[in-house]
């Protein structure tokens, strides 16, 4: 967790490269940042890869944004980052968000339908922005860059919250059910 001002934003986003994942929104938001001291690593593959590469080139962000493809072991990428962004239009159970939190990364997520709001406690455990709103996302990123303490405090709440999704917690719940039969 970052306690001081961040020298360089090292952003990560993980998921299938498809329209509903909102990677175009992240790219647009990054193109609007005042600071150019950032990098974005996107892990995943999918039908939008060519379009995203074109967008990255159009915004002249080739040196800032890397599409690294699908990776089985994502841990080393999470460890290199200091911020996670999820811009999905809708999301069932966002495993990548839980993984990011478990790697001590503060998260900025769209307020999409699905499990994101539950995991980050309706914004108390991370920052939320309106779906498809690259302007608002850009402001959230800038806010984190200027004052990482605020989002890192929210990370603490998220880390407590995601414990209920651990395997150990599920085993305890099943044991309780079987003990009451």
Residue ranges and their predicted role:
Residues 70, 89:
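Aromatic "clamp/platform" in nucleotide-sugar-dependent glycosyltransferases that forms part
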Residues 106-110:
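Short hydrophobic beta-strand element within catalytic cores of glycosyltransferases
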Residues 122-134, 143-148:
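Conserved acidic donor-binding segment of nucleotide-sugar-dependent glycosyltransferases
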Residues 9-32, 43, 47-53, 95:
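A conserved mid-protein helix/loop that constitutes part of the nucleotide-sugar donor-binding site
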Residues 99, 112-123, 127-128:
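Short acidic/histidine- and often glycine-rich active-site loop of Leloir-type glycosyltransferases
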Residues 53-69:
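Nucleotide-activated donor-binding/catalytic signature segment of Leloir-type glycosyltransferases, i.e.
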Residues 167-181:
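C-terminal alpha-helical cap of glycosyltransferases
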Residues 82, 104:
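A short alpha->beta transition loop at the rim of the catalytic pocket in nucleotide-sugar-dependent
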């Amino acid at each position: 967790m970052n306690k001081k001002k961040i020298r360089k934003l090292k952003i990560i986003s993980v998921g299938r490269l498809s329209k509903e994942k909102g990677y175009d929104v992240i790219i647009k938001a990054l193109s609007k940042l005042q600071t150019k001291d950032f990098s974005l690593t996107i892990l995943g593959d999918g039908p939008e890869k060519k379009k995203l590469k074109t967008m990255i080139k159009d915004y002249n962000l080739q040196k800032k944004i890397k599409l690294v493809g699908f990776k089985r072991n994502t841990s080393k990428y999470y460890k290199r980052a200091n911020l996670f962004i999820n811009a999905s239009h809708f999301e069932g159970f966002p495993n990548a968000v839980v993984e990011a939190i478990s790697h001590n990364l503060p998260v900025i997520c769209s307020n999409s339908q699905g499990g994101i709001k539950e995991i980050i406690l309706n914004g108390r455990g991370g920052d939320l922005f309106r779906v498809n709103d690259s302007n608002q996302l850009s402001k959230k990123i800038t806010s984190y860059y200027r004052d990482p303490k605020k989002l890192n405090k929210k990370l603490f709440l998220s880390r407590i919250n995601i414990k209920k999704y651990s395997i150990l917690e599920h085993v305890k719940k099943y044991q309780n059910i079987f003990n009451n039969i």
